[in-house]
Structures are given as structure tokens and as C-alpha cells.
Amino acid sequence: MSLSFCGNNISSYNIYDGVLQNPCFVDALNLVPHVFLLFITFPILFIGWGSQSSKVQIHHNTWLHFPGHNLRWILTFALLFVHVCEIAEGIVSDSRRESRHLHLFMPAVMGFVATTTSIVYYHNIETSNFPKLLLALFLYWVMAFITKTIKLVKYWQSGWGVSDLRFCITGIMVILNGLLMAVEINVIRIRRYVFFMNPQKVKPPEDLQDLGVRFLQPFVNLLSKATYWWMNTLIISAHKKPIDLKAIGKLPIAMRAVTNYVCLKDAYEEQKKKAADHPNRTPSIWLAMYRAFGRPILLSSTFRYLADLLGFAGPLCISGIVQRVNETQNGTNNTTGISEILSSKEFLENAYVLAVLLFLALILQRTFLQASYYVTIETGINLRGALLAMIYNKILRLSTSNLSMGEMTLGQINNLVAIETNQLMWFLFLCPNLWAMPVQIIMGVILLYNLLGSSALVGAAVIVLLAPMQYFIATKLAEAQKSTLDYSTERLKKTNEILKGIKLLKLYAWEHIFCKSVEETRVKELSSLKAFALYTSLSIFMNAAIPIAAVLATFVTHAYASGNNLQPAEAFASLSLFHILVTPLFLLSTVVRFAVKAIISVQKLNEFLLSDEIGDDSWRTGEASLPFESCKKHTGVQPKTINRKQPGRYHLDSYEQSTRRLRPMETEDIAIKVTNGCFSWGSGAATLSNIDIRIPTGQLTMIVGQVGCGKSSLLLAILGEMQTLDGKVHWSNVNESEPSFEATRSRNRYSVAYAAQKPWLLNATVEENITFGSPFNKQRYKAVTDACSLQPDIDLLPFGDQTEIGERGINLSGGQTERICVARALYQNTNIVFLDDPFSALDIHLSDHLMQEGILKFLQDDKRTLVLVTHKLQYLTHADWIIAMKDGSVLREGTLKDIQTKDVELYEHWKTLMNRQDQELEKDMEADQTTLERKTLRRAMYSREAKAQMEDEDEEEEEEEDEDDNMSTVMRLRTKMPWKTCWRYLTSGGFFLLFLMIFSKLLKHSVIVAIDYWLATWTSEYSINNTGKADQTYYVAGFSILCGAGIFLCLVTSLTVEWMGLTAAKNLHHNLLNKIILGPIRFFDTTPLGLILNRFSADTNIIDQHIPPTLESLTRSTLLCLSAIGMISYATPVFLVALVPLGVAFYFIQKYFRVASKDLQELDDSTQLPLLCHFSETAEGLTTIRAFRHEARFKQRMLELTDTNNIAYLFLSAANRWLEVRTDYLGACIVLTASIASISGSSNSGLVGLGLLYALTITNYLNWVVRNLADLEVQMGAVKKVNSFLTMESENYEGTMDPSQVPEHWPQEGEIKIHDLCVRYENNLKPVLKHVKAYIKPGQKVGICGRTGSGKSSLSLAFFRMVDIFDGKIVIDGIDISKLPLHTLRSRLSIILQDPILFSGSIRFNLDPECKCTDDRLWEALEIAQLKNMVKSLSGGLDAVVTEGGENFSVGQRQLFCLARAFVRKSSILIMDEATASIDMATENILQKVVMTAFADRTVVTIAHRVSSIVDADLVLVFSEGILVECDTGPNLLTHKNGLFSTLVMTNK
């Protein structure tokens, strides 16, 4: 055959009837538009004209979409598909002719090239934003439309119709070209780039002008969106450089938390307005979420429907292909009467065409499916960000009583943030399945009926009858889930208390008691988890068993009830449909489970959002301007309006200009006035009543009174933290009579600086804690730190004031934390300063320095209004105004002179106490507590430095090793799956259960493969031999036995996996709790509380409920995938040839993905913890944040942390989509190669059907493998974190002596012998005590003192073996304490700590958690601690409720309870560590006498709060640099004028 365009027949070139009457010339005419476009566009593309014409140079390639962008891409893809069909049709038609006719397919080839060029050209024009170049495309579509229309008309005139494939293709192309032409006309209409005088200029998107935005999914073209092509750069670059936060940049504006918060808030407020009209109705969060995020969910659902409908192309194509192979096998295919013109029916019945259509259908299905996943994930992330913002906004408005009275705990808030928001996010991920699954099932049943007739209804009936069981199981799952969450919350609350009070628990040897309490709650939680695991197993079993039962019922019924034999095409198309039905049935339990969790989460969220809030404080934050008259009267300055919505931002450069203001007139000097005030915490009785006070402007007001009289509550009531039952708090619009306007122009006259009684610090640097968001002023900062005596402490820190002091300031002492909080209040340039008992944790020396330098000089020189709550009555002489409190009421108000005149008895009482305090001040020669704090700080810093140094050394060693290794080794380590962690998890469940799981899984999937192979043999036998009834009974019996075995094994495997996971969770939590409880105290000093708590909350939740179902799904899908590859290879061995390149491609995709995924996962983890800690910090420091009016600043910080975490998670999700799209496309390639190999080489239609069946489902299996493997890798991070704590070294609780060998009443005498004692805090640190030798006689009262870092506190800890005694020994009553079991030692000694700690429960539990004491003994202890009357007044007495942290008692009362706790034990040895620092002077003197009386015959070791308290001691131990330098009575030591003790006394006078 000669090669020519129109064929070798001369008549083919005949144009006598006109050029358009010749089909060849008409086809040639269709080449013109394509040649035109290629001729115009190629120079532009190659020369780069478009890119050089860009008016805006930015870093992203695609930043602009012309109108109709997505429609253009969709139409172009459709046109390319039609061109492929046209090429195929032309080649087939040409093969039926005697000579070659290039005109049949050459224009189609050129059209394909031109269409591809058009979209590339369009993409470049969008990139350059040069729309005038679109004119070439407009002309192209016009010419293509005209030429195709001419061709279609000629076909119509020739009598062709829809039955002719070429006519149909031409008609479709006319429509597509016309639509593309309309798109171009629309662009001209909107952009006006041609034919109009004023072209419309379009600015680039705002996000893409920001170089920090690198998440490009919303901005790239449709092809890149569908394939995540834009992610290639990030995925590949991860091999060269780890992905960091800079690499992923910021979120686009539409995805930021603040944007989505506004949407959700508006929707929720609308629901609140509707609910307000119906008293019994609560606002619906569900409707609010739908209003805010409903549209993207509908879009995702549309994608899901399209994907599900395309999924049914698989069974139909299998049926057609197997039917063609069967006809070929039986020789029944009709090949006679072939026409040169290919009909549509012939084309669609061709086996190869069906294979290609199946391939394209799979590509589209997987593209739509991944698009659906992405949209739901993006929407879920947006929802989570909005919910976090709503929760945080609510936290900032929470009523203080909710937290202090135990109605809402920190653990509950953490659960809302860490668990409930994630539950809702995951539910949104699965949401489209709720309405997609029913449609998928119905469509499957309809197609099954068309294939098998009424027998298909039997299988459908099985599904319908068993469906109610799924509902029953889902109901039980909801009940189990609810009880599990309740027990989990209770367990976390107890765990949180243990972690906060771990030092006290260890010193009192109570850790096992509290551990047992947690374990008891854990047992209850595990019982609920067992029920949850059982019903989860049944749900998984039903999902696996229902399809097998349905297939069995369908085929057995068809075998006996139908008159026709079961053909391979019917059988395997039906099996494919049943396999499609597996997915919705499998997801059903998962969706139901997450729906249940979401319902519970919404209930909790709704309760939280509707909880009580603080009252309106518009009097302090109102928008109104201040009265102008007062400003003009006193300052002569122009009036100013203050924006109350802005966070505190003060100008501090005028500090040195501040001068003392003139005292205002008596009638104008009231800053705050409370009239007839009555306040309460929550809905309880009034805490404060009959409050009528005034706070003078620019003066020092002191509030004094006994412990628990309501001093702190009064401050909080003024700040609006308490509920106002009656009366008013009036903040006067006072003037600012400042000589200098510059000094006060930025000071908010309602602004308050507040130092709470309970110190609160940020997890930030010292400088950031002091400045607290205000601009840094070096002179003011130095003045503040000097006034608070902080500079010596700062000098001890490794990085000075740039050192991060940790969450909640856990690496600082109480006094150091208190002084930083006071420094924060002093630094702020506010009108009013509230200081709540700032001296409580300070010794007298520091207190006096703070009073003189900080309050009297720094604050009063600046003439600021100061309200001071204190027990230090010696400072009353400095007060301009005094408020005396008693039993929640104001006892007296006025100046000291007024009170002297009006209440002589009160004045004389104060005078007595003040004289005592003055005497104590004169005697106090050293700041002993300060030295203790600084020594403790130095020790902690040494510990951290040593730890950091060791880590740095390890990292350097690793880096050196990495440098020595080649690149392949480095990449192997980065891509390594955490198999060791997986093995540890699996072995935690027990080797027997692990073996049973593996064996049952292998056996189950072998049986499933046997079922399908049996069916292939059965149908092939019928197809070839038309076997009779006897053989049919044989096949039915075998099929039934195999299906029954498969159903039984499904039950066994589901139960085994869940039980193994439950056992592993039980063991891991038990080991973690015991390891933490038994850990050394330095571990808690160097590890943030939030980090430890996260192991018990989020990580334990993952191990409990997420890993088992993921593990089951992973093993199932992996074995199914391996089974599929094996069966395809068996059916068509030639497939193995194609499997090699496909396997190589899959390997490299995985290789690149895993590195990037690991980096992104680490970013997600690392950005999640700061977010959780910020919520925890805010909840703990709520009163401080609100007092400073810094809510806006903290909100902004929360939004930044949320966006940072969300962008990491979004990139991680996009990377998963990147992977799945590629694995899906590889799966489609497997289907294509398997189909062509089956069509070409197989002679057995049953095996062809079997191979196609497994090839079709392998795409699902590959996706499940990848998704579950990725999920498991993420979830194993929780196991890895838990395991990292399990490797921690525990304290050595064992001793060489057996507890039974220790005398029952030891120590009875209280004799202490210290022999050559050497102590250190860690093995790599220097000793803090060196060769100490001392002897303490029974019953002696011993005082310990020394300079900073001298080691005196280390000795007290050495008595309890809280530090490492590496040499020497301590002998108590003849027994070396190093030989004693640790629990025995600590349980026989008593200690009173500086920081008071109470636990939730009862007063009885806090005094005697071991339940060893009688009520009389407990009442005696309370009476000694001056608490008996107060406890008797409480409901329940000894059984009265104590809330978490003892928040329903004042700090002083909590310390008194701690003293009573020590009295209950009545050990012969008592150690007092600054025990009276938080109580008033009168109570302290009483307690000192009580200690001397109650412990008169016992040994008392005191870490001196005042030197005066140990001068009269029986023995004084003086330490210097870890060495005991002096040991004698106080008076004797004072006789040695050159001695250290005397020197300390003299230098501090």
C-alpha cells in the first residue's frame, strides 16, 4: 500500500462536485486552524514573549486566573479525550481500507497537538497577565468551530447519524469548540483587552504578593490542583534540606483562623438570637457550622458523587471484556460484514477500547475522589481553627468562679482544645460519606439486579436484614465512647494533680497512693474500652462478613433458582460490584463512630460556650471618650480619645521625666469607689458583703486582715472577676494632674497593672515576662529589676534575661517567680497598680527593699495609684489609706491616724504586731530565702546546661557520623519507618496475641482468595462444558464451605486485633504512669508539665482508640494487595513484566514522599505543643491577662500559633494527596496493563475475570495501604513519645534492708549523724555538699543558714534522698538511710514546704490520704493549725470538698492545711522549708510556738526564713560553698567575731 494523504486511488482527489464535496479535502480543511495555532504560539512559547511581558514580578508562577479558568481546563480535557477517540476511530477505519488514508487520523493527531499547545499557551498567558495574546486562541476556536461545523454538515448530508461513531465525535467536537469560543468571548467581555477603549486591569491576589505565602493550591491551574503538581518542588527539596516553618510559609488569608472564626462566630450568634426567642432551645452549633462551612462540603460531596458513579464503570467494563474473551474462547464472535465506517456500538464493544475506557474512568474517579478528600480536609482544618478561636475567646471571658470552684478544670479545657476540636475535624473529613454511601449502595444493587436478576435481591436482602445490627452496634459504641470519655477526663484530672504536686507526694511517700487512685480510674476506663473494643470488633466483623454472606446467598440462589448457568462475565462483574459495596459498608462503622464522637464533642463544646462569663466591665473598657473638663483644668492639655479595644501598648521613653504630682483636692482624689458592694463566687453565698470603700488617686492604699478574710477577693471584685450581687464599683474619670503631658499621654487612665497572689509566668524569656508586651525601655527595665532585686538572679541564668523560664515558671522558686510578677506590674506604665500580697514568698530583707525601692520610690514617685494587699503590718506607716478586712467585710477604713482615733483596740493590736515585726527586721541579718532561691536556680541551670551539653554532644557526634556516611546512608535513615516502635507496641500486647493475629490474618485472606478462585473455576467450567446438576452441587457445596470459613475467620481476626490493641494500651499506660511516678524530681524540673500531661491525654487517647482500628485496616489492606498482585500474576504471567517498572515508580514515589512527610509531621507535632501550652497558660493566668487588658494581644498570639499549626497540617495533608494521586494513577496503569495482557494472552475467561477483578480493586488496596501506613506512622509517634519516657531512669526505691527489718516506730529518738556526706544533683555535675560531718541530738531544734549556693537546702533534700548521695552517709537512729527502702524512709519523716499544695477531694483526704488517723487526731491537727472553727463551719466538716489545687481556699489557708498535714504525721523529725512565708505575722508567731510545743521532744530542722528564728536554736549549721564551716549554738557562734555566722549578721545589719 502506498502512503498518501487521501489514499492511492485517484478518485480520492476528485473535486468536480466542489472542494467541500470531497471528504478528504474537508479533513484537510480541518488542519488549517491547528497549523495556524501552532505557527502563532510556538514562537511565543519558545521565545518567552509572554513571560517577559509580565507587569508584576512575584515569586509564584501562577498567580492569576482569567474568567472561566476552570471551565476552560475541563473543556480542554474533554476535547483531548475526544481527539483520542477520533484518532482511534481513524486508525481502525483506515485499517479496514485497502490503502492508507492519512486524512482519517492525521487532522485528529494535529488537533490533539494543537489542543495541548492551547492550554500550555493559555497557562503562560495567565502567568504573564498579558491577555492580548489570547486573541490568537479566540481566532483558533472560531476557525476550529467553523471547520468542524462544515464537516458535521457534510456528514449529515451524506446520511450519517448518531449510530456512526465519526458523526458523533464530530458533533461533540463542534459543541466543545463552540463552548471554548464562548469562553474566549466572555474573557473579552470582562477583561476588555481588545475591541474596548478601557481595558480592565486585574491586580494579583493579595496572598501571592506576600512572599511568605507558599501554599499555592487555591491559586494554581486546574491540572496542578488535581495532581498537586505544585507540591513537587517541596517534596523533592526535602531530600536536600529538611522542611522547616520558613519553607511552608504562611496560610492564605481565606484559610487563616481569624477569617474562619468570624464566619463561624457570625453564624453562631445568629443561632443564639434564634434560640433567645425560645426559652427551652439552645443555639445549634451544627447549624452554625453548616452556615459557615456548608458550601465546600457540598462541593466535596459533588466530587464524591462523580467519583462513585465513575467507579461503576469498572464492573461494566469487566463484564464487556470477559464477554469478548469468552466469545473469542468459544468462537462465537461475529467478524463478518465489517464496514469501512466504524459504528458507535462496534467501538464500545471492542475489548481494547473498553480497557482504555476503564483506564480513563479510573483516572477520573481517583482525581475526583482525591479532590473530595482535599476539600473536606481543608474545610476541617478551617473549622478547627475557627473552633479554637471560639474556645479561646470564651476562655478569656470565663467567669473566674468556673475555674476556682471546680465547675470547669484545666483538664477539661485541655480536652476541648486537644481532643474535641480534632474529633469534629475528623468527622468533617468523613462527612461526605454519610450521603454518598446510600447512593453507592443503591446503584450497586440496581446493577446487580440487571446482571443476575432476582437472585441479586437475595444478596441485597441479606445486607438490608443485617443493617439493623450495625445500628445496634453503633448505639452501643456511643454508650461505650461516652463512658470512656468521662473516665478519661477523671483520670486526666487526677494525673494533672499528681504532676503538679509530685514533689510533695515524693517527700511524703504518697506517690503510690495517688498512683493507685489513677489506676482505679484507669480500670474503669479500661472496662469501657473493653466494651468499645468488643463492639468495634463486631462492627469490623459485620463489614467483612456481610459482603461474603451476600455473595454466598446471591450465587447459591442463582445456581438453583435461575434456569441459566452462571457465566464468568456475570460472576466477576457481580463480584466487582460487591467489592464496591465493601467500601461504604467498611466505612459505615467508622463514620458512625466519628459521628458519635462528634455529637459528644458538640455537646461538650456547647456546654462550654454557654457557661457563665464575667460581668460587663465597660466602665473600664468603654469606647466613650473621657471627660475633657478635668484634663483642661489640671493639665492644660488637649483632650484625647483612648481606644479601649487595642491591647496595652505604652510609650516608656518618658520614664525619666516623671515628676511627683500635686495632691488633688479631697473631693477629686477618688480613683475607685465601691458602694454597698456585695460579691460572690458563682451562684453561692456572698463572699464579700457591705463593702463601702474608696481608693484615693495617686496614693498608697493598703488592705490588711487575717488569712481568709477576703483581701484578695476584694481586689478581684474591683477588677470585675466576681459576681456582683448588689452595689456598684465606680472607676472615677479622674484627672491626670501631671505637669508634663509627655509623661502621661499614652497612659490609659483606667489601665491596671496587677500582680496576683498566685504568681503566673509565661513560657517565655525573663525579659518578655517583665515587659509583657510593652515596648522595651532600657532605663525603666533596669530600674524595675533593681527595685525587685532580680539582677543577681538574672545573672545566674545561662542566657541572662533572654533565658526561657519554662511553662508556669517551673524552673524558678516561688520567691523568684513572685518578684518577676511584681516587676511586670511595676514595668507597665499604668495609672493603677494592684499588688496582691507581693511579700508572701519574700524574706524581710527583700520585702523591705521592694517596699522602699519599688513601691515608695518607683511607684509613688510616679504618683500612681497603688493598692497593696499585705500581712506586713510594719509597712502601715507608709500607707496613705488603709482598709482593714474581717470575715468578708470592711472592718475599718481611713488613714492610720483615723484608725488610731476611731478604733483604739484595733490600733493597739496592730501596734503590738508592728513592734514584733520591727524587732524581727532588726534581727534579720540575711536574705536566707533569697540565697536559697538563687542556689536552687543555679542548681537547676547547671542541670539544664549539663543536659543540653550532653544533647549537643550527642547531636555533634551524630552530625560527624552523618558527615562520614555517604548520602545514601543519610537518606536511608531519614526514610526509615519506625519499625522498632511498631515492634514495641505489638509486643506490648503480648506474644501470644501477636502470633494469633498474624496466623488468623494469613489464614483468613488465604480463604478469601480461595473463594474467588473457586468461583473462577466454577464459572469457567460452566462456560466450557455446560456442567450438569451433579457438578453444580459440588461447586455450590465447596463455595459455601469456603464462605463459612471466611466469615468465621473475619470474627476471629477482628477480635484478636482489638484485644491485642487493648492489652498494649493497658500495659503502656501502666508502665508510663509508674515510670513517671517513680522518676527523679529533676525530671519534673526540666520537663514542662504540659509535655508530660500530653502523654497521658492526646497520646494515650491515640494508643487507646486509634491505633487498633488503623492496625487492623493496614494488615487487611496489605494482605489484600499482596493477594491481588499474586492472583493477577497467576492469571496473566506476562503482567509480571509490567509490574517491574510500576514497582520501581511506586518505590521512588514512596521514597520521596516519606522524607517530606516525616518533616511535615514533625512540624505538625512541634507546632501543636506551643498552641496547647498557650491555652493552658491563658487559663491559669486569666485574671492577670484580663486585669492588664491584654486579651487582644493574647488572642493574636493564639491566632498565630493556630495558623502555624494549621499550615503544617495542611501541607501534610496535601503531601498525602500528592502521594495518593500518584499511587491511584499507578493503580490505573496496573489495570490497563492487566486488561491488555488478559485480552491478548489468556484463553480462560474465568481467570481473565479473576485477574481483572483483582486489578480493579488493587487501586483501593494501594490507597488503603498508603493511608493506613501514613496514619500508623503518625500514630506510632504517640507510642514513641511514651516509650521515650519509659527509658527514663527511675529513683532507686529498693534498699539493702527489708521493710520488715525497720523498727515499727523508727525513727523514735530523732538522732541524726552525718558522716562525710557528699551530694550532687546529677552525675555530671559538681558536688553541692562536700564531706559534711554533723551530729544532731534527739529533740534538738536545728537551724540551717548560709550564703547563696552554700548547700543548706541540699542537706534537707538529702534527708529524703531526693538528691544523689555519692559518698558518705546519714544515720538516723542508728540506721543508714541509704540502706532503707525509699518509701519507708520518706514515710517516717515530715516536711513542710514553702508552696502550699492541696488536692481535689475532701479535707480528710488532704490531711490523711492513707486513712490511718482517727477523726479526733485530725481535729486536733486542725485546731493546732487554727483551722478547726473554719472547717466546722463548712458543709461536711472533715468531708468538705476541696477543689482542684485547693482553689476554694486562700493561699494562707492552704498553707495552714499543709501545716496541719505535718502535725497529723507527728514524726520524730520535722523539716520546715520556709513554711510560714505565705501567712501573716500573727499567725506565724502562733505557729512557731505551736511547733515548739507540739514537737518539743522531737527533732526540728529549719531552713531559716529569718535569722532571728534560728539564733536561739539548739544547734546552727552554717554552710559555705557546700562545706559545713560552723556548727554550734547561735549565741556561741556570735561570740566568734571573725566567724561566718557573725560576718553574715554584721554585714546585713
Swiss-Prot record:
* Domain ABC transporter per the UniProt entry, residue ranges: 665-912, 1312-1546
Q: Which residues lie on this side of the membrane: Extracellular?
A: 1-30, 94-101, 154-167, 323-350, 445-455, 553-571, 1012-1034, 1149-1245
Residue pairs linked by disulfide bridges in the UniProt entry: none
State the Gene Ontology terms under molecular function: ABC-type transporter activity; ATP binding; ATP hydrolysis activity; sulfonylurea receptor activity
According to the entry, every stretch annotated as the ABC transmembrane type-1 domain falls at: 297-597, 994-1274
Per the record, the major location class is: membrane
Glycan attachment residues as annotated in the record: 9, 326, 330, 333-334, 1025
Q: Where in the cell is it found?
A: Membrane
Q: InterPro entries attached here?
A: AAA+_ATPase, ABC1_TM_dom, ABC1_TM_sf, ABC_transporter-like_ATP-bd, ABC_transporter-like_CS, ABC_transporter_C-like, ABCC8/9, ABCC9
Which residues are listed for ATP 1 binding in this entry?
705-712
Give the CC-aspect GO terms: plasma membrane; protein-containing complex
Question: What superkingdom heads the lineage?
Answer: Eukaryota
Q: Which residues bind ATP 2?
A: 1346-1353
Q: Give the protein's recorded name.
A: ATP-binding cassette sub-family C member 9
Organism (species): Oryctolagus cuniculus
At the highest ranks, the source species' classification is: Eukaryota, Metazoa, Chordata, Craniata, Vertebrata
